[in-house]
Curated annotation (Swiss-Prot):
Spans through the membrane: 37-57
Compartment(s) where it occurs, according to its Swiss-Prot or TrEMBL record: Cytoplasm; Membrane
Pfam families found in the cross-reference section: CLIC-like_N
UniProt source species: Caenorhabditis elegans
Tissue: Expressed in the secretory system, hypodermis, vulva, pharyngeal muscle, rectal gland, tubular rectal epithelium cells, and tubular neuronal support cells in the head and tail.
Organism phylogeny: Eukaryota, Metazoa, Ecdysozoa, Nematoda, Chromadorea
S-S pairs: none
Taxonomic superkingdom: Eukaryota
Similarity comment: Belongs to the chloride channel CLIC family.
Protein name: Chloride intracellular channel exc-4
Keyword Oxidoreductase: no
Length: 290
């Protein structure tokens, strides 16, 4: 039923709670991680607790269509978290977030620092992207190649403009703060929310929309590069093929067999020109061009 990704414990394992996170499996291969954003978000938060020795963590992929899963979890959908020691199963996102929050607070882990400015910049980014995605996919139906943004009708271009405006605002915030993460030099809940969504926007933009995050948003790209060098993100990130398959299923788009047979790959590099600009600004001087 489940493929386990065990994060080894630091120190005395018996003194720390064991948290089992069940995440949705890939629609291509049930042994691989699926592209559910909330699953990755909670995985990253739990990884942050593991890294400093607060908790033991096991992550298991589950095929939500299997009879074993339906029987064991009675219709609940991933993410699901189990804390066996307390005989508790958390099936609601707010319950999972609440348990992680209390653990972080108990051990003084600054994972849930509140920042209205950062919150305002990132809220609705993904919603606006989904509106753009749905509108453009519908417009491009029957076309061999995605249409160019400049050729889109005004009612679709408005969604594109909103996405770019929000990306620009995040780029500006990062420029002002001069920090690796949104709130400073440590990852917080805002990064666990934003990093996976930016990655999905990038992968789906390039594969389905003929769209890329504007290359002049240098501080935003430096932030994306930080994601690609953050263990919590790397461990929890699905393959490109699984992200694309996830959205094609949502959009009812045809997936040919060749795509499902491809070896899984993960895009964790950025364009050379962008990387060069990042170096010039001294944002990541130790990174080599790929």
């Amino acid at each position: 039923m489940a493929e386990a990704y065990q994060i080894q414990s630091n120190g005395d394992p018996q003194s720390k709670p064991l948290l089992e996170l069940y995440v949705k499996a890939s629609g291509i291969d049930a042994r691989r991680i699926g592209a559910d954003l909330f699953c990755q978000e909670f995985w990253m938060e739990l990884y942050a607790l593991y890294e400093i020795g607060v908790a033991r963590v096991e992550v298991k992929t589950v095929n939500v269509n299997s009879e074993a899963f339906k029987k064991n979890f009675l219709g609940a959908q991933p993410p699901i978290m189990i804390e066996e020691e307390k005989e508790l199963t958390y099936t609601d996102n707010r319950e999972i977030e609440g348990r992680i929050f209390h653990l972080a607070k108990e051990f003084n882990v600054p994972l849930f620092e509140k920042d209205p400015s950062a919150e305002k910049r990132i809220e609705n980014l993904y919603r606006n992207f989904k509106l753009f995605l749905r509108a453009k996919v519908e417009f491009d139906k029957g076309k061999k190649e995605p249409s160019r943004v400049e050729d889109l009708p005004a009612q679709i271009k408005v969604h594109y403009n909103r996405v770019c405006e929000q990306l620009s605002n995040i780029d500006q915030l990062l420029s002002e703060r001069k920090s690796r993460y949104l709130l400073g030099n440590s990852m917080t809940e805002y990064d666990c929310e934003l990093m996976p969504r930016l990655h999905h926007i990038r992968i789906i933009g390039l594969s389905l929309l003929g769209f890329d995050i504007p290359h002049n948003f240098t501080h935003l790209w430096a932030y994306i590069l930080t994601a690609y060098r953050t263990a919590a993100f790397i461990e929890s990130c699905p393959a490109d093929q699984d992200i694309i398959h996830h959205y094609k299923e949502q959009m009812n788009l045809f997936t040919n067999q060749r795509e499902t047979l491809q070896s899984p790959t993960k895009t964790h590099t950025i364009p050379e020109k962008v990387l060069s600009d990042i170096r010039v600004k001294g944002l990541a001087p130790d990174v080599n061009v790929h």
